[in-house]
């Protein structure tokens, strides 16, 4: 799926958030554009102001889960790929010595929720959010860690699980339906 999403060109903004530059390689090898911190503001402004007459490639950013506001057509597809990493020394140390401690679990949930909020900024806004990576999916669906998410996020996760179970009976014989939207 990673290479599939990276190969497409979109008539709207599409964003993948990965926990490290290493995780971005599959996307960039297939056409996704890795955007560094110094280019991020320009890319966000481009996506916000674009009328999408010309299709755009998937924007890939590394370990930036907050501070990006991509409402409306600036982001109609958001991919969160794998469990986030901690950047600061204190959290990184805590994660290594107590990976299942409440504090780390709460901080991970907060970081994931911040990522989920990048594309939907208001009640009339919408986007498709794809969670990838066994570690991330396990974390958000685990009964213990699920309690660290807000009620709204828990509901979104339940809706996603329902959609996934319904879609198991169907398969895309062609990606033309996806490309139409």
For each feature predicted by the language model, list its residue ranges.
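Beta-propeller and closely related beta-pinwheel folds
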Residues: 1-3, 33-51, 58
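Conserved interdomain hinge at the start of the Helicase C-terminal
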Residues: 1-18
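Conserved beta-strand elements of the Class I
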Residues: 13-17, 33-35, 117
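Conserved helicase motor "Helicase C" RecA-like lobe of SF1/SF2 P-loop NTPases
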Residues: 19-38
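Short, well-ordered alpha-helical microsegments
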Residues: 24-25, 44, 64, 68
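Short secondary-structure boundary/capping segments
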Residues: 30-35, 74-78, 92-97, 143-152
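Conserved RecA-like P-loop NTPase helicase motor core
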Residues: 49-139
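Long, largely alpha-helical accessory region at the distal end of helicase-like NTP-driven motors
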Residues: 122-181
């Amino acid at each position: 799926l990673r290479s599939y999403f990276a190969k497409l060109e979109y008539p709207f903004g599409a964003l993948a958030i990965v926990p490290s530059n290493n995780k971005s390689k599959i996307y960039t090898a297939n056409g996704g554009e890795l955007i560094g911190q110094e280019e991020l503001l320009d890319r966000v402004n481009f996506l916000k102001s674009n009328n999408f007459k010309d299709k755009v490639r998937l924007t890939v950013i590394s370990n930036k889960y907050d501070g990006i506001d991509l409402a409306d057509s600036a982001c109609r597809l958001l991919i969160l790929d794998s469990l986030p990493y901690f950047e600061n020394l204190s959290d990184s140390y805590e994660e290594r010595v107590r990976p299942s401690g409440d504090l780390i679990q709460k901080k991970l949930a907060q970081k994931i929720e911040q990522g989920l909020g990048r594309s939907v900024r208001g009640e009339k806004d919408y986007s498709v959010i794809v969670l990838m990576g066994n570690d991330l999916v396990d974390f958000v669906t685990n009964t213990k860690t699920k309690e660290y998410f807000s009620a709204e996020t828990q509901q979104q996760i339940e809706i996603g699980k329902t959609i996934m179970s319904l879609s198991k009976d169907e398969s895309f014989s062609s990606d033309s339906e996806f490309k139409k939207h």
